[in-house]
């Protein structure tokens, strides 16, 4: 079906400057989150060369180590989370570059350089974990959130909260 243009709202590159205009202290951390990432996991099934980047099973945006880290000592879990989230940030940035949608990243990076925000990091999350089979039917696994805690954990870790 056609997309209803009235429901789209403003483009991300227009929204972020409005949000940044309301930050003044330079202490805020900005998490740029791609939600509904389960939908993007379906793209490698189509024959489009731009989707190939999503087919790599070793990519951090195709893995979620949140539960595995709970068995680690807090300092090791924090170090692994930091390394993982930095790698994920690089992958999401590359994905935006691949689809020629760097405007939000450029605006956010400039705000960090100017001191309007303390840091910026990219995340990919999915509340459901997998695309439903039909409009009213979940997959066999049901709801299995994917990386939804990452932005929150990043914020907490900056405040010294043990992960």
Model-derived regions, located:
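Non-catalytic alpha-helical scaffolds
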Residues: 5-6, 28, 39-49, 109-163
